[in-house]
């Protein structure tokens, strides 16, 4: 049996990516650039001869629309789709909606980077009923409680068990699975796949719209540690741009 494949695709540029705002669970849409990135991601998938058989994505439109655009470009729009909140972006708490550069200037680089990139430091909580709260959002009505803030450790705790139970078995059977998600939900997954330490994960940045492919053996092990970007040059530039967020 041939190896299975996981295609990790971070959503294309969102409206708040373009304005350098913390987004989290706020349901902003793609920009025109983001739509173009999603289309190019799908074209790369097709050009490399990859054939996704199922899609997993979040409940946020920037990931859902990225997946639709990419699958259309790859001629795979017909495949089954599973949407689950556990693939959502990290909840940024009271930082949601704030400009990153202004936040860094106000609180200092050390606190800014701890909130943004440390493994287990949560930003301040977002109060229920606040402007960017999801406490009354109908898509989360079945949750016992909606997060008020999260660190990356929290994202690992909600996403990785779901991945092991629902997604990994498909890859172990040789399937090709597309996972269209977010910077931090994908960082959580890559941390697990590559066994990255809690300290080192701070240095990992996922670029928008560029597919990252992992080959998975029948026993669930990763055949190509670190994964393979379908456009390495663009991925390096994109990751550097993500790392530089917070600058004016």
UniProtKB/Swiss-Prot annotation:
Its EC number is 5.4.2.11. Coiled coil: none annotated. InterPro entries: His_Pase_superF_clade-1 (IPR013078), His_PPase_superfam (IPR029033), PG/BPGM_mutase_AS (IPR001345), Phosphogly_mut1 (IPR005952). One of its GO terms (molecular function) is phosphoglycerate mutase activity. It catalyses: (2R)-2-phosphoglycerate = (2R)-3-phosphoglycerate. Keywords: Gluconeogenesis, Glycolysis, Isomerase. One of its GO terms (biological process) is glycolytic process. The active site is at residues 11, 89. The record marks 182 as: Transition state stabilizer. Pathway: Carbohydrate degradation; glycolysis; pyruvate from D-glyceraldehyde 3-phosphate: step 3/5. Substrate binds at residues 10-17, 23-24, 62, 89-92, 100, 116-117, 183-184. NCBIfam families: pgm_1 (TIGR01258), PRK14115.1 (NF010713), PRK14120.1 (NF010718). Belongs to the phosphoglycerate mutase family. BPG-dependent PGAM subfamily. Catalyzes the interconversion of 2-phosphoglycerate and 3-phosphoglycerate. This is 2,3-bisphosphoglycerate-dependent phosphoglycerate mutase.
């Amino acid at each position: 049996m041939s190896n299975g494949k996981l295609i990790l695709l971070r959503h294309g540029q969102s409206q708040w990516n373009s304005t350098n705002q913390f987004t989290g669970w706020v349901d902003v849409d793609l920009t025109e650039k983001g739509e173009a990135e999603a289309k190019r991601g799908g074209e790369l998938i097709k050009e490399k001869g990859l054939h996704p058989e199922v899609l997993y994505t979040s409940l946020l439109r920037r990931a859902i629309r990225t997946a639709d655009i990419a699958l259309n470009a790859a001629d795979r729009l017909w495949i089954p789709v599973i949407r689950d909140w556990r693939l959502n972006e990290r909840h940024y708490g009271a930082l949601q909606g704030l400009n990153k550069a202004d936040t860094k200037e106000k609180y200092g680089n050390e606190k800014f980077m701890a909130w943004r990139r440390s493994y287990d430091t949560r930003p301040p909580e977002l109060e229920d009923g606040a402007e960017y709260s999801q406490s009354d959002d109908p898509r989360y009505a079945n949750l016992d409680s909606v997060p008020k803030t999260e660190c990356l450790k929290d994202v690992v705790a909600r996403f990785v068990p779901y991945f092991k139970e629902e997604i990994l078995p498909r890859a172990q059977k040789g399937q090709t699975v597309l996972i269209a998600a977010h910077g931090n939900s994908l960082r959580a997954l890559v941390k697990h796949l590559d066994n990255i330490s809690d300290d080192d994960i701070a240095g990992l940045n996922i670029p928008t719209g560029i597919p990252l492919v992992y080959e998975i053996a029948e026993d669930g092990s990763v055949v190509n540690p670190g994964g393979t970007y379908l456009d390495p040059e663009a991925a390096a530039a994109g990751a550097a741009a993500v790392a530089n967020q917070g600058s004016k």
